[in-house]
From Swiss-Prot:
EC number: 7.2.2.13
Subunit architecture: The sodium/potassium-transporting ATPase is composed of a catalytic alpha subunit, an auxiliary non-catalytic beta subunit and an additional regulatory subunit.
Protein's name in the database: Sodium/potassium-transporting ATPase subunit alpha-1
Topological category with respect to the lipid bilayer: Multi-pass membrane protein
Compartment list: Cell membrane, Sarcolemma
Proregion residues excised on maturation: 1-5
Organism: Anguilla anguilla (European freshwater eel)
Catalytic site: D375
Length: 1022
């Protein structure tokens, strides 16, 4: 990526003439390029070599004419927006994708059938026309609803644009100029100061106390020092490179631009995130599988009966009408709306629990998740450095790191602690922002870096106001922290009259501080710093460092009054005061502590077999300590390094398979082949990836997906966006998350709490179970809707159930009950189950079809036919008379058709009886659907065990009954929908069948519970 001539642009488009294969190969190559580690060598160059490579004078910068040439060659310093999907295409996908397509085909077939009838008959029935119109309306309404739900999604590049700084200070022709950041070119000499955003990737040429916040890029929460020194082979870790769009927190720096726009590290991440192919959600794959089943059944039945009707001597036009009728009757019209509404309801329920779902289908994906790759900072941890331990009086004391200060407290009476607290408060530039007196100390905003803020809050909590302490000890002189000295020093007036007038306080890297000390304070008394005390210090330092904590050393010195009288001029440039032979006081160590709820949440993920992997940009020791703290590495599980240390043998002699846990450094990951990565993911149950780059996060996600896992990724930085986009479900943080990560994600945790993910998994699993129940309920009524049509063709009887009445069931009485199943409570502890295997555990499987169609559906059809035959018999047509009567029955010109008793019936009278039969068949289906709804509440438990607590479902039972009664008895329905009033006794014909369905299924589930894995479970447990 270092660019003398500057043409290694990462554009992801290819020219058309190369043909599609070339384009695909190029795209794959581009993607592979982007996934590679950042390949920079500019950090290794000396300033002379840098001058030769970019032609930049390190005092005068580029000439304006040269800058214009480079701008013309490389283009503006801006990120290229990715090709976006137009809104109309998104809308069309909702209208014509998946399930909608099936309904459209149904609608077209209806219009076709109506067309054939209109061409061949004088007065065609309008049923097929109505059906076609209703089907089209259903698709359009649900399509608009889904589009509206998802319209708020995926604006990735817009937020990347927000990251681009507006202005930049460059030096051209020896003059400082403030120009638009888009005009910055490679080779420009740029100046940045605290508060600025870095305008491009810079090679630092000079710096004064410069620190940058790389957290959005690398995930490191601490500000990083920037200086001209080459400190690391890895360009992401070296001190002399500052990255585009990170923030300069303090100090100033001057540097040469080495990359602009898409060629910057951030540009590569942006291109990578926006050009990733996103896979389909598990639920959309399930729905497609379901459509294949339904379509298969419909076409098989349709074609079979088409051939049969031709054999039975029907005209081919009639046979085509039958074919279309059967195919359409198989389409569950209400199901599309049911699924959409169920997912929306769950999304709303999750929003109340702080999970905001951007993409409806992601609701279920989270339930199928088998691996969670979680970022550390801010997700598993509180994202605030906190003092965790102190070492003074030769003893380690534990501080309280809990969010609500409910943890341990230590002995604060020691004089050494008072001295330590005084240094931590005075040798500290952090201050609380104004007007926060009523805010709890831990929640207050602080101006200053993370470590100093932690010390400030700790001292404020333990010792009262730090401001008062600073007022009493006025600061006279200060040497700020720098990377060469590795300490910070300040001199204060001492208000305590028993001590000398001036107090020197110092903090910094523990080993550097100890080197400057000759005495140590123990229990308030100074004593010589002997080897024994040095060993004690070393042990404490190693122990705290091993906990992944950032350790600082503290010392002080009372400047003698005879040499440093009041008014003495302290010179911090030519130091005129002692900085050796000081008195060592103690250590304080800080960590970004785990969130309180995370340990429990990780445990909850573990019990159903969800693997939790930590992926972080932080140091391996810190990462491992937090992983142990939150249970990602569980107690007693060792890494290869732990085993080697325990057995006292070299690491390479340990068999990696013996270690259940594993900490992989980004540097090692870079050199692993995909096979080696697969091996790690397969054979270690507890994994931590530390010091990872954005590209590596993506490679880890792809590795998990190769194992067949459904992967959820949590993250908050820009660096997480490619992984969030690639994952089956990306989960971003709502509070700390960058805009970019929120746009790339499918779900946002509004409270940034990992524990909310567990709630999401639970809801996702529940919706999958409940969708199964809803589909089982909806499909069952398909059989009593299709069989009347089949008998109409085969047995030549008057039509028992009309098209309009079928619509009244699918889009009327069945809708509310089907949706009410989305509110059903979980049957058992769904968080104890293993994650769903997408290959074997389908939303709709053969067993569900067998129960819905073959068993319950057949009983329902029998109930309908029983009522149909009862009504016709009461009107004089016994079953034996009905066979073969259809042609005469439907003939308008036959007005003297005799029944079983010799009575003659006109066409009008016959049709009134037929439509009354349609209405009663419809009412019977409603009554048997009562039982079906109740048995669909549970797949394994008894109804008595499950209870009838679902209020929406009880409402659904009353609603469908009331609707059926309304359609039957409302005046005018005979004209509008051809539905006629029923005698009260006819409602009761279906009751025995309803009871039979209930008892049959209770018995089936009883056997299922008594004989787990038995024949009944294998054949009927859906």
């Amino acid at each position: 990526m270092g660019r003398g001539t500057g043409h290694d642009q990462y554009e992801l488009a290819a020219t058309s003439e190369g043909g599609r294969k070339k384009k695909r190969d190029k795209k794959k190559k581009d993607m592979d390029d982007l996934k590679k580690e950042v390949d920079l060598d500019d950090h290794k160059l000396t300033l002379d070599e840098l001058h030769r490579k970019y032609g930049t004078d390190l005092t005068r910068g580029l000439t304006s004419s040269r800058a214009a040439e480079i701008l013309a060659r490389d283009g503006p310093n801006a990120l290229t927006p990715p090709p976006t999907t137009p809104e109309w295409v998104k809308f069309c996908r909702q209208l014509f994708g998946g399930f909608s397509m099936l309904l459209w085909i149904g609608a077209i077939l209806c219009f076709l059938a109506y067309g054939i009838q209109a061409a061949s008959e004088d007065e065609p029935a309008n049923d097929n026309l109505y059906l076609g119109v209703v089907l089209s309306a259903v698709v359009i309404i649900t399509g608009c609803f889904s589009y509206y739900q998802e319209a708020k999604s995926s604006r990735i590049m817009d937020s990347f644009k927000n990251l681009v700084p507006q202005q930049a200070l460059v030096i051209r022709d020896g003059e400082k100029k403030c120009i638009n950041a888009e005009e910055v070119v490679a080779g420009d000499l740029v100046e940045v100061k605290g508060g600025d955003r870095i305008p491009a990737d810079l090679r630092v040429a000079s710096a004064q106390g410069c620190k940058v916040d790389n957290s959005s890029l690398t995930g490191e929460s601490e500000p990083q020092t920037r200086s001209p020194d080459f400190s690391n082979e890895n360009p992401l870790e070296t001190r002399n490179i500052a990255f585009f769009s990170t923030n300069c927190v303090e100090g100033t720096a001057r540097g040469v631009v080495i990359n602009t726009g898409d060629r910057t590290v951030m540009g590569r991440i942006a291109t990578l995130a926006s050009s990733l192919e996103v896979g389909r959600t598990p639920i959309s794959i399930e729905i497609e599988h379901f459509i294949h089943i339904i379509t298969g059944v419909a076409v098989f039945l349709g074609v079979s009966f088409f051939i049969l009707s031709l054999i039975l001597g029907y005209a081919w036009l009639e046979a085509v009408i039958f074919l279309i009728g059967i195919i359409v009757a198989n389409v569950p019209e209400g199901l599309l709306a049911t699924v959409t509404v169920c997912l929306t309801l769950t999304a709303k329920r999750m929003a109340k629990k702080n999970c905001l779902v951007k993409n409806l289908e992601a609701v279920e994906t989270l339930g199928s998740t088998s691996t969670i790759c979680s970022d550390k900072t801010g997700t598993l941890t509180q994202n605030r450095m906190t003092v965790a331990h102190m070492w003074f009086d030769n003893q380690i004391h534990e501080a309280d790191t809990t969010e609500n200060q409910s943890g341990t407290s230590f002995d604060r009476s020691s004089a050494t602690w008072a001295a330590l607290a005084r240094i931590a408060g005075l040798c500290n530039r952090a201050v609380f922002l104004a007007e926060q007196s009523n805010v709890p100390i831990l929640k207050r905003d602080v101006a200053g870096d993370a470590s100093e803020s932690a010390l400030l809050k700790c001292i404020e909590l333990c010792c009262g106001s730090v401001n008062d302490m600073r007022d009493k000890h006025v600061k006279i002189a200060e040497i700020p922290f720098n990377s060469t000295n590795k300490y910070q020093l300040s001199i204060h007036k001492n208000a305590n009259s028993e001590e000398s007038k001036h107090l020197l306080v110092m903090k910094g890297a523990p080993e550097r501080i100890l080197d400057r000390c000759s005495t140590i304070m123990i229990h308030g008394k100074e004593q010589p710093l002997d080897d024994e005390m040095k060993d004690a210090f070393q042990n404490a330092y190693v122990e705290l460092g091993g906990l992944g904590e950032r350790v600082l050393g503290f010392c002080h010195y009372f400047l003698p009054d005879d040499q440093f009288a009041e008014g003495f001029q302290f010179d911090t440039e030519e130091v005129n005061f002692p900085t050796e032979n000081l008195c060592f006081i103690g250590l304080m160590s800080m960590i970004d502590p785990p969130r309180a709820a995370v340990l429990d949440a990780v445990g909850k993920c573990r019990s159903p077999g969800i693997k939790v992997i930590m992926v972080t940009g932080d140091h391996p020791i810190t990462a491992k300590a937090i992983a142990k703290g939150v249970g990602i590495i569980s107690e007693g599980n060792e890494t290869v390094e732990d085993i080697a240390a325990r057995l006292n043998i070299p690491i390479n002699e340990v068999n990696p398979r013996d270690a259940k846990a594993c900490v992989v450094h980004g540097g090692e990951l870079k050199d692993l082949t995909p096979e080696q990565l697969d091996d790690i993911l397969k054979h270690h149950t507890e994994i931590v990836f530390a010091r990872t780059s954005p590209q590596q996060k993506l490679i880890i996600v792809e590795g998990c997906q190769r194992q067949g896992a459904i992967v959820a990724v949590t993250g908050d930085g820009v660096n997480d966006s490619p992984a969030l986009k690639k994952a089956d479900i990306g989960v971003a943080m709502g509070i700390a998350g960058s805009d970019v990560s929120k746009q790339a994600a499918d779900m946002i945790l509004l409270d940034d709490n990992f524990a909310s993910i567990v709630t999401g998994v639970e809801e996702g699993r529940l919706i999958f179970d409940n969708l199964k129940k809803s589909i089982a309920y909806t499909l069952t009524s398909n059989i009593p809707e299709i069989t009347p049509f089949l008998l109409f063709i085969i047995a030549n009887i008057p039509l028992p159930l009309g098209t309009v009445t079928i619509l009244c069931i699918d889009l009327g009485t069945d809708m509310v009950p089907a949706i009410s199943l989305a509110y059903e409570a979980a049957e058992s502890d769904i968080m104890k189950r293993q994650p769903r295997n997408p290959r074997t555990d389908k939303l709709v499987n053969e067993r569900l079809i067998s129960i819905a169609y073959g068993q319950i559906g057949m009983m329902q059809a029998t109930a309908g036919f029983f009522t149909y035959f009862v009504i016709l018999a009461e009107n004089g047509f016994l079953p034996s008379t009905l066979l073969g009567i259809r042609v005469k029955w439907d003939d308008k010109y036959v007005n003297d058709l005799e029944d079983s008793y010799g009575q003659q019936w006109t066409y009008e009278q016959r049709k009134i009886v037929e439509y009354t039969c349609h209405t009663s068949f419809f009412a019977s289906i409603v009554i048997v659907q009562w039982a079906d709804l109740i048995i669909c509440k549970t797949r394994r438990n008894s109804i008595i065990q499950q209870g009838m607590k679902n209020k929406i479902l009880i409402f659904g039972l009353f609603e469908e009954t009331a609707l059926a009664a309304f359609l039957s008895y409302c005046p005018g329905m005979d004209v509008a929908l051809r539905m006629y009033p029923l005698k009260p006794s006819w409602w009761f014909c279906a009751f025995p069948y309803s009871l039979l369905i209930f008892l049959y299924d209770e018995a089936r589930r009883f056997i299922l519970r008594r004989n787990p894995d038995g024949w009944v479970e294998r054949e009927t447990y859906y």
